[in-house]
Amino acid sequence: MYAFVIWDKKKNKLFGARDIFGIKPLYYYPMADAGDGAPGVLFGSEIKSFLDYPHFHKAVNKKALRPYMTLQYSATEETFFEGVYKLPPAHYFTVDIPTGKMNIERYWDCDYSAVEKPFEEYVDELDEVVHESVEAHRIADVKVASFLSGGVDSSYIAACLMPDKTFSVGFDYTNFNETNYAKELSDKLGVENVRKMITADEFFGALEDIQYHMDEPQSNLSSVPLYYLAQMASEEVTVVLSGEGADELFAGYEWYEDTPEMRSFKKRVPLGVRRALGSLVQHLPYFKGHNFLTKCAEVPERWYVGQAKVFDPSEVDKVLKPAYDTGKNAAEMCAEYYKQVPNCCELSKKQYLDLSLIHI
């Protein structure tokens, strides 16, 4: 994972790149006049690093709100700060300083070409790759820890890593506390498990600080436990691994698969009839079964806008004032990603979309 910028003094050019999944952020702000009459560009891993620059114009990007209402985070290259952009994952940029001309190119993309191998061979190959990646993070002579929820993904990483410590958080409410699983695995590995129970007051009390560190609006509440995990870990270690991203890679989300009811409905009802029903309900007020008929009628391009969906794009248009409805809606934005995988199966299309949006 990386985000870096290199200054080529001989060619008077700037080169910047971001890792393939966008784990590390990289923001930039092109300027027609950097203060000396010549063009320039600000860049950094946080937008707040631009705020004190005298020629940085502080203004809200009204176009950013429309897709945010559906996806619950800033998922476009444009940020909520007017004129500030995110370099997309797996992209690099070059800037010719004398002219200010910027060029952005993609250097990597997912490959869904089928490769026929025995299942056991896939398992062995995957295990080898994961162990190699985990081991690469242990090169530095520092303590390494892992975030451990007790679920499959983080447990696998912890078992491969054998960290110095594991960190877990739970909620001070019986039905939302799974730290006992993390403690059980840590004991089996012979590793100390550091735990914290988050109270309701602590949960809501952290939101303002979280928003400050995120630079942009973020309404996915998983950021709260991650905030406390990072806070605990930073007091004791400098490197932490987690199981983030595994659901997108290995189709772990429940919405990647049709429910038994959907499979039965698709088997009994012809596609033409399902599409007619799907088109009909799009013009009707919401009712129980509305989403069911929509999902059974069409391919993902017609309804799937990512696993973090809050408001349907049509609902967003009903609540936004005219000044804020000029940006792309989520469906339009996602369509650009679907165009990259036109011949893939429905599952791969959903995965490609989520992998493309996971850290943009």
Which positions does each model-derived feature cover?
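ATP-dependent adenylate-handling active sites, centered on carboxylate activation for C-N bond formation
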Residues: K10-A17, I23-D33, I97, C110-L347, ...
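A short, Trp-centered hydrophobic/proline-enriched beta-strand micro-motif
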Residues: Y2-I6
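N-terminal segments that mediate ammonia production and transfer
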Residues: W7-E120
